[in-house]
Amino acid sequence: MVRKITELEKVLIQKSKPPDRTSHFLNKAVKLGLENKYAESIVCLDRVIRINPKLAIAWYYKGTALNVLGQYQEAIICLENVHRNWCEAWNQKGIAYANLKKYFEAITCFEKAIKFDTDNQSAYAENKARVIKELEENNV
């Protein structure tokens, strides 16, 4: 359920033109994430966030890395700092809630991901379907 960075996101990082230090640590964090070095990536992302706490992509990557590391509550907190119409952030938030067994919150997040991204609705719908199935199996 965790995905790799897309080419579009790479372009968005480059186009956002943050200050040099921010760009350096953000690029390093992305590289470390692609190497599955999530804890090290988070250290870099924390530096980016200290420099520019409004840089949504840093919060998104940190939330995604925390999800991979199983730190779901912390992931949700990070993902709260991402733009409300960023579908992949809603998807990551849904994954975190699902792993915390907060199924109704997860479903809501997946529905928002579907709403904001008409191109990838099937991936988010699959995540939503998994949560609904788990709800049914656990008689919640």
Identify the residue ranges that each predicted region occupies.
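Start-of-helix register in tetratricopeptide repeats
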Residues: 23, 57, 88, 122-123, ...
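Register position in tetratricopeptide repeats
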Residues: 34, 68, 99, 130-134
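Canonical positions in the second alpha-helix
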Residues: 47-48, 81-82, 113
